[in-house]
Amino acid sequence: MKFPLLLALLVGGASALHLSSETSDSKSPLMDENLPRDAEISGPEGEECPPGEELMPLEGEKEEGSGSEGVPGDEGAVSGQDVTDVDLQCPKEEDTTSLMGDSGCKTCRYLLVRRAECFDKAQSVCRRCYRGTLASIHSFSVNFGIQSAVRGINQGQVWIGGRIKGWGRCKRFRWVDGSSWNFAYWAAGQPCPGGGRCVTLCTQGGHWRLSHCVKRRPFICSY
């Protein structure tokens, strides 16, 4: 009685051992070579600039960018959005001076507004009160004409319509009216990292400087 039972147990054990060996030799679905590896399914490392949008770092600036980008108020100014100020009041006539257009643009009109505003507010005043924008400058003659008209005011700098757009390696200088950035008249050492993201024109000499967009300054509209 005991011998047949023992024989049955031995045969059953050998069958189970053979089945286990076959299972271990087969491939696990979790290790299938056709499944993507971690490197293949990971997301992109970072956003790349569109073709032609790269800008070399500003003078003395490291690739990772300057600390000025985190200055409160500057980010909003470079977005190009107008100030949502329902109580915006247009400047009084005595606070403005009309400037002549240059010989290459008889229809161009410029306006000096002596009332000091931040960059965003200045752009909003130009748009809402004069149906224009902060001035874009594309030639030395225009730059010289504007500087000659503003050098008598008791302010060292005035806003024009230039700004830095984008971040990191994708930073570029742009005009708020969307025109081409084909002329610049920077002061020595400019554009300077940490100096801000909006562009001013110096009333003495006419050179340009970067400034923090939240500063209040007189400004030049073109319309």
From Swiss-Prot:
Nitrated. Residues 124-223 form the C-type lectin domain. Residues 20-81 are annotated as: Disordered. Pfam families: Lectin_C (PF00059). GO terms for cellular component: collagen-containing extracellular matrix; extracellular region. Residues 1-16 form the signal peptide. InterPro entries: C-type_lectin-like, C-type_lectin-like/link_sf, C-type_lectin/snaclec_domain, CTDL_fold, EMBP_CTLD, Eosinophil_major_basic. Keywords: Antibiotic, Antimicrobial, Disulfide bond, Glycoprotein, Immunity, Lectin, Nitration, Proteoglycan, Secreted, Signal. It is found in: Secreted. Glycans are attached at residues 23-24, 66. The keyword DNA repair does not apply. One of its GO terms (molecular function) is carbohydrate binding. Disulfide bonds join 126-221, 198-213. It comes from the Eukaryota. SUPFAM superfamilies: C-type lectin-like. GO terms for biological process: defense response to bacterium; defense response to nematode; immune response; negative regulation of interleukin-10 production; negative regulation of macrophage cytokine production; positive regulation of interleukin-4 production. Its main location: secreted. Residues 17-106 form a propeptide. Cytotoxin and helminthotoxin. MBP also induces non-cytolytic histamine release from basophils. It is involved in antiparasitic defense mechanisms and immune hypersensitivity reactions. This is Bone marrow proteoglycan. It comes from Mus musculus.
